[in-house]
């Protein structure tokens, strides 16, 4: 087993008490790379609550955050590096990708004893930059800050936002844009593509080191299993099935589910062209680069399975020395993923429509509601929220029916729903409370994100950004003062495409 996770001796208490296990792995896992300084950094947002959770000195970091989170100042104990990985991008394999604009500063052990990465995105070029400038524009940095923190508040496993800094210098894309650096916190940044990097090189020794490291760090409960590497594939499959089910429960579309954007830890990562669905349509795509709809809303579970199959391929030489046996064992897990996902998804959908018990007909009940929503172009988030309100009192039926173009279209479904509720033991009050706890009032709607970004980029005005963060921190509360944030966009406000950035 790997021994890279032992704690290093700490002689003093720096503002970030680094303990860098990944940097103790062999050199083929990364390239040492310091951030490139920027002209005039300015701290625009610092997550002091997360800093406290991580055991950091929030006071020092807020005071000196511009220099620290831009990469201009390197703290004691940091061992900056760019991680090596490969990946399938829209189905095509690229044997070397790696961190082209991200630099891992190091790791900390948080107050709950969990090891967490701290990474700068947009901190300058690395050996993996592939002719890129290694920089990030302000807009994508704000988008990732907003959406990752919103996902956390929704209760979905995700990377976190620790800080955002403007650089005082432009980045050049189709036009000159203000530059920024994003500080991301993750359980780790190990991806399916990290395994693919070594598999593509036939480097089984490094694969074994990586797999043992991942078991130590993320899945210590399986380290003594008879077939540790098969158990690893199974554990990752379970977390991914649960994660993607949660995405669907809130109408989230990742947008670029390449294997280099799928974490081994089971966290959502890389929010470049992501978006939340307004009107329900399972074929919804927002990403400008997803021209074939590969990563559409309803395709996400199948893509998760496809990505897991790619992970399984890399683990074959570790699972069993006989290839046919290894393939058979791995295939068993990959094939079981669909049923596993369906179990997680249906459990969540039962909760969304207020069911505490299970009946075989529940799937039909859920699917028939979704069919009416699609036909009527009903807003995904608002419809389920209003259903929770309706569960509290029949007086709220008109508001629920108003989610549909033809309010009468949902009446047959409501009759079936009420009949089913009659066989469910919850009281109306308990049911409504439970439903409002899983059906958010607020999600980061695309038009609100774009408004916040436009104000920041064009006017240096971060008030909309701050307001949006405040609303999204309490997604399951009604917040009457912010009721407009719960509404879908007007036709002129609709965002039809999102773009990669960070």
Swiss-Prot record:
GO molecular-function term, one example from the UniProt record: AMPylase activity
Presence of keyword Acyltransferase: no
Metal-binding keyword on record: yes
The family this protein is said to belong to: Belongs to the SELO family.
Name of the protein in its database record: Protein nucleotidyltransferase YdiU
Cofactor(s) annotated in UniProt: Mg(2+); Mn(2+)
Residues reported in the UniProt entry to bind Mg(2+): 261, 270
PANTHER family listed in its UniProt record: PROTEIN ADENYLYLTRANSFERASE SELO, MITOCHONDRIAL
SUPFAM superfamilies in UniProt: Protein kinase-like (PK-like)
HAMAP family, per the entry: YdiU_SelO
EC number: 2.7.7.-, 2.7.7.108
Record's signal peptide: none
InterPro entries: Kinase-like_dom_sf, SelO
Keywords carried by this UniProt record: ATP-binding, Magnesium, Manganese, Metal-binding, Nucleotide-binding, Nucleotidyltransferase, Transferase
Binding site for ATP: 98, 100-101, 121, 133-134, 184, 191, 270
Class of this enzyme: transferase
Taxonomic lineage of the native organism: Bacteria, Pseudomonadati, Pseudomonadota, Alphaproteobacteria, Hyphomicrobiales
